[in-house]
């Protein structure tokens, strides 16, 4: 039976089946019903056509693709066939030219094809089969090794070559060990003995050849050990494989062409004879069927002999294969090649052979050459065409095969060398430029295994049974020969492949190297060449693989010859050594740089074993041997190893060596000089070598260990360079990297081979020497020891540390640079190794620290100082703190380069001693350590982090010395007064350096601030950088910029700290609070939290003392208590947090500490600074900031605040720092990635591992980035984060605190200036909470953050937040996220009065209690607050509360929340109260609806948008939302469940305000949402009424509840109605989405329902003027065609709600209010917040509304909005309407109107219209008017709302809201909105879709035309009807979509489009339309809920029903009907 591929749905089902079934149809006029049915049928048909068109498009597209593919394949096949045809002719000739083809039976064609030149780039051709190409297309790109080129000495491409060069493996594999050489020698001797016996044996065998051939012929294939192919096939197989054949392919081809026929005959005869002879030979000779075959017997000049022998051995050897297969000429050539190859094969073994054999080999070669000449002569004579002779000759040759085999070893080598030299010389010359590298690579690629086999076969020649031997030779000898060639070529690659090619050939060299007969006279050259070939190959290969073999071999070679040293380096010299040699020993660099280099190595020869090992082990050999041997030797060894490494790296070494080594190398010629010379020359000049060695010991050894320099380079690069040695750098380097920094040792450990060697060498020597001497200090302390040895005072040490710390920071700066550079390296190199990168980065830092220490200690120290200094200077420029410290560090370095260098180096190494080093180290490394030694940092985390800082004893000292030097000084100093200022401010100071003396800063703070900041900064920087590196490294140091932006370390540190600093105050306060609780509960409350804030305010400096002492106690006490932990946690928080998560406070800190994480150290450093900064920020903020929201803005921006802080006193400087933090925070906030990035670096990059950091990270991210990003995380992060905020606020709120605290917060907020006592109250509460909940830190952190952002807000606010937080923390440890969100909110709300943040917090707290996730919402509200910074504090609280509730309701809302945040951003200007209202509303809502969150989020968004609107509006909104949430907890849940996308809708609403509209509702939902938004925008009154009412209640806490309840009831009714209606879920979802909007919706129900009727009850109530709103018909025929109307009609949009406007607005509000109410309040709020233009007025209105709600205003606003909606619709129905609509309506709407409207709206279709409005609003947010989507994207949705009697459908092009500020050209839903066709004129019928289609409205003028003419659309009966309909359906026109004015349907849109006059006329039709609508909805039962709302609720209900139907239809019909319904509802 046929399969149905596509089925078209019934047009009736596609139309509006409910129209036919609707019970309301009975109530409709028959004409209307018929019109509706007609339209429905038409729509169904259109939809069918659309479906068919879509299907056909798919079919044709598929056909086109197939045709294209087929054609492409045909072309490829054709091209392939052509190429094949062109290639076949020579093959055919070759095959046909042979007289006998029997060998084909034994030889695969692929085996003899090798004689044919191989093509290249076979897989690059475009005509390959798809099956082949697919495998390549699926391949990944090669690693971006080229990124490392700049760090490599070799220049561009060197790294890629280095790590992709197959010769490395070939050499490595081909390099036999000394034992192999010995074997080879024995084998040669054995063969010599055999050769003497062979002639006789061969003679004897010759007689039996034919018999044995026949007998054994069958065994030919098996005699080669498991090879099924005959020896011929083997030989042929080998031939193709030999690169020589490829190289010689030209010659071979020529010779082949020349002697093809003769050779074929001969070869045929020979093949037979060979076959027989070989069989006989094998059997008779070995008895086991194997023969020692002759690779090539005759010299190059005797091809005949070769052919004979080749054939004889041909069955046995590849040469013979070729010979047998190929004609004479070819055979000769091939034989020559083979001879060459065998000689090479022998060559390789010879190369393996020690120089001892060279003489023997030379002698034997001479003898063999003589012998070869003889046999070749014999063969030549026998080679004649006579087959019998040839057979006999072959027999004899075969007999002589063994002799020849030996001879071949000698002569063959010689010949092959000469031939190879000639051939290679020729080929090399020919292909030198091109093929050389390629052939080498290819040869290497193909020869690698062969090389190994060759070596084995060579070594096994006598040891292995000859069948196996022959197998190898037959198969391998050629390859070996090839490999020998390749090796020689490759070996000489170092020599240079060119040399082989150019040297006619190192025939001697090859002979020598191959034969192992390095002529004494040639020893220098040949040895160098041969050794390099062998050794270098070995050396190069053995570097890693066979260190000892190579080593033993190399030693013997080296021992045998000094030249081998040269040889050894030859390879290096090629890359590194020239530099090496160049610097070190210009001795023989010349052409034989290798040799010269080798001499350098020769100088290093003592280390030559080491060198090989080093090559092998790189550093370990260096380390082992260097330790074993002289340091110079070692350095030399290492130096060679570098050279080797360099050869390996070839880039790095040269570069590194040049840079690092050059200095060293200049004296490098002298082992000691080379080694010490660099450090000594560099350092010893300053410091005695002993000191240098002792102090810098690791440095001199380390540094002077030029390998270190290389290591540096290699380590720096080794991480890279060595890391470049991918094998190791990943494994070793990463740990090394991290550990290197952590400990030079770890790096060394991690890079045991290389880094470890280098570093370890450094380390080892230092460890052994220094480390053992001072193992603790000496590890890094080796540096430390150097430092200690330097005996710099701790101050100096500190300063040195600073130098060190700075050096580390510098390193990190260098790191940054380096990381910048190195990260590239690291990143470039170890992108693979992300963590390694980080470690690498870290390592680089370390590497730089270490390597730099080493390098820097010698040269780089200066260099590094240069780096450090420059970076310091630069960094100093970047980081004043660091700059200071850096300067100091620089100065320290400057203090004494010796000291600085030695010390700094020492210090850097001493840094480990410095604990700062550890801190830096750990700080730097911490992230690293933490990252790298997660094990450590987790266990030691506090220890390592802080301990790292304090690790050296700092922790034990409680970081007294290091940390205390950091911490202790902070404790002692900082803890006292300065300590806090110095310590925490030490960052502040460090940042500003103003408050604490640079000395203190430098010494104390510097260690602390710098050490910590830098350390931490290093860490953050490092982590930031490193995270940037680690995280950012992959990120390419995105964050470093961020870090840099923040002051990098400050950024990360500060940002967290900022969050934490304040939070530290909060957190620290809470932390400190615990201490401070201990210190003083009251002070804890006031001084502690307030201390941080209020006291910081009042006691700013005093309380800083106290705060410092206390806060230090807190920060430090806690940090020290847990400060160490906290700090630790702070420092370690990432660590400590994880580690200290155990600890409540640390967890708090963790939470806080998360911020503290970086902030903790910073906190420790910064806690003071925050006290300073925070106090400065806080104090100033309270003084200034609270007073100056601007500062808050600045604060919020933190850039600004930093700027403002700049305005702020020196504390400001910390403030600046703090602002940097804050700035970072704003980054964090503003940049989610920055939050995520900054914190994430720490968190994610650094402590993602840490649960809490993740949590903060997630939360933090989720707050900022995660929220938007983690729309997944939002729940997680948001929930967590929310839980933070949620818990905290919840506790506040839920503890009556919400009301009391919230008001308190609000009061506090509003009472920003409230005295500290109030703050203490808050603080006390906070203290209590803190007491109650150590975790509260999270909340505190939020509070802190909030405080931070709200710093300007009085401390009490922060306290409130804290208090709130406390409970929250109590409830939810993770709440800090929420709090953090809240913080962010506060941050953004910083400008908002302090109370706002608390309110938000309180609300959040409440919510958080209920919903942990809420924090996301909070975060959003935070963000919202952030964006809504301008909004009064209450607003933020409102937002927070709302968000809290919302979050509570919807964890996932975070997206929405995030959106709301963004919205809030847009709505920053909105008064705080508004946010508060939103918040309040949200709380209930959240309680009620977890999912409501979206709505809440929307409401937050709305609140955000509404924030701009007067605060009262928002509160009303919020309250309403709360009520709504309360009313429909399940709905939100079902809605959310039902509408994850509905949240999307909400999200869209948010997104609308925010670009983040990632969730798209179905067309219906989207349209409804957009329409709701649009309507809402158009009828701001509703938001205003609702908003003011809510806001007013918000201001009056009870009121929101009342309002909330009322809206809730309305919503219930509305939703009930709507919900009951078919589209209930969607509607509810819409409502839920609307959430807060629903109350609006309730008001708007009228718009959504029956515009006038609904408006009549509600609006009439709401609109005292009783002005009726005319429906606006919007024509967008052009829109349908994708044309944008040229000009929107101009509507007056009074910003202030004048009475007239108010009346108008009231009228419009009736519609728009209903719509808006129908649309989510969030939309409304969003609109408000999105009404920045009108915001001032709306805000005033809001405020006035708050104080007094005037329906007039709301009406006026609605009317204005309505006008705006008309404008917007006219303007483009998307951008314009959105932008126009979003403001005005909300501000003006009064609460009363709003309430009534809300009821109606809610009853009607709050969800739909709110959704629509939101979408509309979204559009308006983004706003530029945009034309309707192109026709191809247009979807004509028709969902008759309640079977409206209107026969006309208006094509409604919903405004495409610009998602994310972009016009998302999704498939806009075009809805044919049925409009009641009550009109009598026939235009309705004539105006059917057809008329509209031509883009002509029933007015005959397109909208654009009308707009151009500035005419308002003509009113037509249909338009009036539409207006009525619109009144009934809701103000469709307000929908921000373009409506295609299909005259039949014009009523709906035309109402929107109509001028106000028409709007006024609307009421005439409205009642009838309403009635029609009432009758219309078939889902009357669902409108029963609407009936619940019956007042005019019936109308509303019907409207709602319509919407519901639409919604339901949307659900049923894919959202199309919903859109219509929505549009109707909204339009109505």
Swiss-Prot record:
Transmembrane segments: none annotated. Residues 189-199 have a biased composition (Basic residues). Residues 203-219, 258-276, 1513-1524, 1644-1663, 1710-1723, 1737-1754, 1981-2004 have a biased composition (Polar residues). Residues 171-188, 366-382, 1922-1931 have a biased composition (Basic and acidic residues). InterPro entries: SCAR/WAVE_fam. Residues 1473-1483 have a biased composition (Low complexity). Signal peptide: none annotated. Gene3D superfamilies: 1.20.5.340, 6.10.280.150. Expressed in expanding cotyledons, expanding leaves and expanding siliques containing developing embryos. Detected in unopened flower buds. Reduced expression in mature leaves. Residues 171-244, 258-283, 366-390, 416-443, 877-903, 1469-1491, 1511-1536, 1639-1663, 1710-1754, 1911-1931, 1977-2028 are annotated as: Disordered. One of its GO terms (cellular component) is cytoskeleton. One of its GO terms (biological process) is actin cytoskeleton organization. Contains the N-terminal Scar homology domain (SHD), but unlike the genuine SCAR proteins, lacks the C-terminal VCA (verprolin homology/cofilin homology/acidic) domain. Belongs to the SCAR/WAVE family. Interacts with ABI1 and ABI2. This is Scar-like domain-containing protein WAVE 5. It comes from Arabidopsis thaliana.
């Amino acid at each position: 039976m046929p399969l149905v591929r596509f089925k078209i749905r019934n047009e009736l089902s596609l139309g509006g089946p409910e129209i036919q079934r609707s019970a309301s149809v009975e109530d409709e006029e028959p004409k209307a019903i018929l019109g509706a049915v007609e339209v429905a049928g038409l729509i169904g048909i259109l939809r069918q056509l659309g479906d068919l068109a879509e299907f056909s498009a798919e079919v044709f597209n598929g056909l086109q693709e197939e045709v294209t593919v087929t054609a492409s394949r045909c072309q490829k096949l054709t091209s392939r066939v052509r190429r094949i045809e062109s290639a076949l002719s020579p093959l055919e000739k070759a095959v046909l030219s042979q007289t006998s083809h029997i060998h084909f039976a034994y030889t695969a064609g692929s085996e003899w094809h090798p004689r044919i030149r191989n093509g290249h780039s076979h897989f690059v051709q475009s005509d390959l089969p798809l099956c082949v190409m697919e495998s390549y297309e699926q391949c990944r790109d090669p690693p971006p090794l080229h990124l490392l080129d700049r760090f490599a000495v070799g220049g561009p491409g060197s790294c890629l070559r280095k790590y992709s060069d197959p010769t490395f493996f070939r050499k490595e594999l081909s390099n036999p060990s000394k034992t192999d050489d010995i074997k080879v020698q024995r084998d040669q001797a054995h063969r010599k003995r055999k050769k003497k016996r062979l002639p006789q044996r061969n003679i004897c065998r010759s007689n039996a050849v034919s018999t044995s051939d026949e007998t054994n012929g069958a065994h030919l294939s098996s005699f080669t050990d498991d090879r099924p192919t005959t020896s011929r096939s083997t030989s042929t197989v080998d031939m193709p494989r030999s690169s020589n054949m490829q190289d010689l392919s030209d010659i071979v081809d020529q010779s082949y062409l020349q002697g093809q026929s003769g050779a074929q005959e001969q070869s045929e005869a020979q093949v037979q004879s060979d076959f027989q002879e070989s069989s006989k030979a094998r059997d008779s000779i070995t008895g086991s069927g194997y023969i020692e075959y002759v690779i090539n017997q005759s010299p190059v000049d005797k091809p005949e002999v070769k052919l004979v022998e080749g054939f004889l051995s041909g069955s046995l050897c590849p040469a013979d294969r070729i010979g047998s297969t190929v004609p004479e000429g070819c055979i000769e050539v091939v034989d020559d090649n083979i001879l060459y190859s065998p000689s090479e094969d022998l060559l390789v073994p010879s190369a393996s052979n020690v120089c001892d054999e060279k003489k023997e080999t030379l002698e034997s070669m001479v003898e063999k050459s003589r012998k070869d000449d003889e046999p070749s002569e014999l063969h030549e004579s026998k080679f004649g065409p006579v087959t019998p002779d040839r057979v006999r000759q072959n027999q004899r040759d075969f007999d002589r095969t063994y002799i020849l085999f030996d001879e071949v070893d000698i002569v063959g080598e010689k010949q092959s060398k000469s031939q190879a030299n000639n051939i290679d010389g020729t080929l090399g010359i020919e292909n030198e430029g091109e093929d050389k590298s390629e052939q080498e690579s290819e040869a290497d690629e193909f020869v690698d295994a062969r090389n190994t086999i060759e070596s084995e076969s060579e070594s096994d020649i006598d040891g292995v049974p000859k069948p196996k031997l022959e197998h190898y030779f037959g198969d391998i000898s050629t390859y070996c020969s090839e490999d020998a060639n390749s090796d020689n070529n490759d070996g000489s690659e170092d020599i240079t492949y060119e040399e082989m090619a150019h040297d006619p050939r190192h025939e001697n060299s090859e002979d020598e190297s191959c034969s192992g007969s390095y002529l004494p006279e040639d020893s220098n050259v040949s040895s160098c060449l041969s050794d390099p070939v062998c050794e270098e190959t070995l050396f190069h290969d053995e570097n890693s693989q066979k260190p000892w073999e190579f080593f033993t071999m190399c030693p013997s070679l080296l021992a045998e010859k000094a030249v081998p040293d040269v040889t050894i380096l030859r390879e290096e010299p090629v890359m590194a050594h020239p530099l090496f040699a160049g610097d070190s020993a210009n001795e023989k660099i010349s052409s034989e740089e290798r040799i010269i280099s080798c001499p350098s190595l020769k100088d290093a020869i003592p280390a030559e074993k080491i060198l090989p090992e080093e090559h092998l082990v790189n550093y370990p050999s260096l380390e082992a041997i260097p330790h074993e041997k002289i340091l110079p030797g070692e350095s030399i060894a290492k130096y060679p190893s570098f050279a080797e490494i360099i050869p390996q790296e070839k880039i790095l070494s040269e570069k590194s060596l040049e840079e690092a080594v050059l200095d060293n190398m200049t004296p490098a010629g002298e082992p000691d000089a080379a080694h010490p010379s660099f450090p000594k020359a560099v350092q010893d000049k300053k410091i005695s070598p002993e000191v240098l060695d002792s102090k810098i010991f690791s440095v001199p050894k380390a540094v002077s260990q030029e390998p270190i320099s290389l290591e540096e380079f290699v380590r720096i690069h080794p991480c890279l360079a060595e890391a470049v040695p991918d094998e190791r750098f990943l494994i070793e380097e990463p740990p090394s990297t991290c550990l290197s920094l952590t400990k030079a040792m770890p790096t060394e450990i991690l890079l045991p081979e290389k880094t470890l060697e280098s570093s370890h060498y450094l380390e080892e020597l230092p460890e052994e020497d220094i480390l053992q001497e001072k193992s603790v200090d000496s590890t890094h302390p080796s540096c430390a020891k150097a430092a200690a040895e330097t005996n710099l005072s701790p101050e100096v040490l500190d300063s040195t540390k600073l130098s060190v710390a700075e050096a580390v920071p510098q390193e990190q700066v260098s790191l940054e640079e380096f990381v910048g550079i190195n990260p590239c390296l690291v990143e470039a190199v170890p992108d693979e190794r992300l963590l390694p990168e980080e470690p690498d980065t870290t390592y680089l830092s370390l590497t730089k620290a270490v390597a730099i220490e080493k390098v820097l200690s010698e040269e780089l120290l200066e260099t590094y100082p240069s780096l450090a200094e420059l970076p310091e200077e630069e960094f100093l420029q970047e980081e004043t703190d660091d700059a200071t410290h850096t300067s100091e560090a620089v100065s320290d370095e400057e203090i004494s380069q010796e000291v600085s260098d030695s010390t700094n180096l020492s210090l850097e190494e001493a840094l480990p001693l410095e604990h700062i080093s550890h801190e830096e180290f750990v700080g730097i490394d911490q992230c690293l350590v933490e990252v790298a030694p997660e094990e450590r940092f987790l266990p030691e985390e506090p220890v390592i982090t802080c301990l790292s800082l304090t690790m050296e004893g700092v922790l034990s000292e409680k970081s007294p010395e290091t940390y205390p030097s950091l911490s202790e000084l902070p404790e002692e100093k900082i803890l006292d007064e300065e300590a806090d200022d110095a310590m925490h401010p030490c960052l502040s100071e460090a940042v500003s350096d103003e408050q604490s003396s640079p000395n203190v800063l430098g010494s104390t703070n510097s260690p602390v601030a710098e050490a910590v900041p830098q350390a931490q900064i290093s860490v953050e920087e490092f982590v930031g950088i490193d995270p940037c590196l680690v995280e950012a490294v992959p990120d390419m140091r995105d964050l470093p910029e961020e870090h840099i932006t923040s002051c990098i370390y400050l950024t990360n540190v500060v940002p967290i700290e900022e969050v934490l600093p304040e939070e530290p105050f909060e957190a620290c306060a809470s932390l400190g609070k615990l201490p401070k609780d201990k210190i003083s509960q009251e002070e804890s409350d006031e001084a502690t939290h307030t201390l941080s804030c209020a006291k910081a305010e009042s006691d700013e400096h005093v309380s800083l003392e106290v705060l410092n002492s206390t806060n230090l106690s807190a920060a430090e006490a806690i940090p020290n208590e847990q400060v160490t932990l906290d700090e630790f946690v702070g420092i370690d928080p990432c660590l400590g947090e994880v580690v200290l998560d155990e600890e409540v406070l640390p967890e708090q800190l963790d939470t806080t500490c998360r911020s503290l994480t970086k902030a903790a150290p910073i906190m420790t450093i910064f806690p003071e600074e925050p006290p300073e900064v925070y106090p400065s920020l806080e104090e100033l903020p309270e003084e200034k900031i609270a007073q100056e929201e601007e500062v808050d803005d600045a604060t919020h921006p933190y850039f600004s605040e930093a700027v403002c802080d700049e305005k702020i006193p020196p504390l400001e400087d910390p403030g600046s720092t703090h602002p940097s933090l804050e700035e970072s925070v704003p980054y964090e906030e503003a940049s989610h990635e920055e939050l995520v990035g900054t914190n994430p670096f720490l968190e994610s990059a650094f402590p993602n591992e840490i649960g809490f950091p993740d949590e903060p990270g997630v939360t933090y991210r989720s707050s900022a980035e995660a929220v938007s990003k983690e729309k997944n995380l939002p729940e997680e992060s948001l929930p967590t984060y929310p839980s933070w905020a949620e818990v905290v606020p919840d506790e506040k709120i839920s503890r009556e605190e919400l009301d009391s605290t919230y008001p308190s917060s609000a009061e506090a907020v509003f009472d920003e200036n409230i005295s500290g006592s109030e703050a203490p109250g808050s603080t006390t509460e906070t203290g209590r909470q803190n007491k109650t909940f150590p975790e509260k830190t999270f909340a505190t952190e939020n509070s802190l953050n909030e405080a931070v952002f709200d710093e300007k807000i009085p401390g009490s606010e922060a306290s409130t937040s804290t208090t709130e937080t406390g409970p929250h923390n109590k409830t939810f440890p993770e709440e800090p996220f929420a709090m953090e969100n809240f913080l962010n909110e506060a941050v953004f709300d910083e400008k908002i009065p302090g109370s706002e943040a608390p309110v938000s917090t309180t609300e959040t707290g409440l919510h958080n209690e209920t919903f942990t996730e809420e924090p996301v919402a909070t975060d959003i509200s935070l963000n919202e607050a952030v964006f809504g910074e301008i909004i009064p504090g209450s607003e933020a609280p409102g937002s927070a509360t709302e968000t809290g509730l919302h979050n509570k309701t919807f964890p996932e809302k975070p997206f929405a929340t995030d959106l709301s945040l963004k919205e809030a951003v847009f709505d920053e200007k909105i008064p705080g109260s508004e946010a508060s209202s939103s918040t309040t509303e949200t709380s209930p809502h959240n309680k009620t609806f977890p999912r409501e969150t979206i709505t809440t989020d929307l409401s937050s968004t709305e609140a955000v948008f509404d924030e701009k609107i007067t605060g009262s509006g928002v509160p009303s909104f919020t309250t309403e939302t709360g009520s709504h949430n309360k009313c429909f907890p399940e709905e939100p849940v079902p809605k959310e469940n039902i509408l994850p996308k509905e949240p999307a809708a909400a999200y869209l609403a948010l997104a609308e305000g925010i670009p983040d509209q990632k969730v798209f509702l179905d067309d219906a939902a989207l349209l409804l949402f957009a329409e709701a938004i649009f309507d809402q925008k158009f009828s701001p009154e509703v938001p205003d009424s609702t908003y003011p009412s809510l806001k007013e209640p918000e201001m009056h806490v009870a009121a929101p509840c009342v309002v909330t309840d009322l809206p809730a009831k309305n919503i219930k009714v509305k939703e009930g109605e709507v919900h009951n209606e078919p589209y209930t879920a969607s509607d509810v979802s819409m409502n839920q989405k609307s959430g807060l909007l629903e109350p609006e919706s309730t008001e708007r129900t009228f718009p959504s329902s029956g515009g006038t009727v609904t408006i009549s009850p509600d609006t009439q109530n709401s609109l005292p003027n009783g002005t009726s709103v005319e429906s606006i018909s919007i024509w967008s025929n052009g829109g349908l065609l994708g044309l944008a109307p040229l000009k929107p009609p101009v509507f007056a949009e009074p910003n202030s709600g004048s009475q007239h406007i108010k009346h108008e607005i009231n009228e419009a509000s009736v519609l728009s209010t209903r719509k808006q109410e129908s649309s989510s309040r969030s939309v409304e709020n969003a609109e408000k917040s999105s009404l920045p233009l009108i915001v001032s007025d709306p805000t005033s209105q809001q405020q006035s509304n708050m104080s007094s709600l005037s329906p007039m205003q709301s009406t006026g606003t609605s009317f204005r909005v309505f006008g705006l909606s008309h404008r917007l619709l006219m303007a483009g129905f998307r951008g314009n309407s959105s932008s126009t609509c979003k403001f005005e309506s909300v501000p003006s709407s009064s609460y009363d109107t709003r309430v009534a409207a809300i009821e109606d709206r809610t009853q009607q279709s709050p969800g739909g219209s709110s959704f629509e409005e939101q979408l509309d609003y979204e559009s308006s947010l983004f706003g530029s008017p945009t034309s309707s989507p192109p026709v191809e994207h247009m979807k004509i949705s028709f969902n008759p709302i309640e079977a409206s009697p209107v026969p006309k459908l208006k094509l409604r092009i919903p405004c495409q809201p610009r998602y994310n500020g972009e016009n998302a050209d999704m498939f806009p839903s075009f809805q044919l909105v049925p409009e009641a066709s009550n009109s009598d004129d026939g235009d309705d019928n004539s105006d059917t879709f057809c008329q509209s289609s031509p883009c002509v409205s029933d007015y005959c003028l397109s909208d654009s035309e009308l707009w151009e003419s500035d005419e308002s659309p003509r009113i037509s009966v249909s338009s009036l009807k539409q207006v009525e309909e619109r009144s009934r359906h809701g103000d469709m026109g307000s929908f921000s979509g373009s409506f295609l004015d299909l005259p039949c349907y014009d009523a709906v849109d035309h109402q929107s489009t109509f001028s106000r006059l028409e709007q006024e006329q609307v009421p005439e039709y409205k009642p009838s339309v309403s009635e029609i609508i009432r009758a219309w909805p078939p889902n009357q039962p669902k409108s029963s809920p609407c009936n619940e709302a019956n007042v005019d609720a019936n109308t509303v209900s019907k409207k709602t029903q319509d919407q519901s139907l639409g919604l339901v239809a949307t659900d049923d019909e894919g959202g199309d009907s919903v859109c219509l319904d929505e549009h109707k509802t909204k339009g109505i």
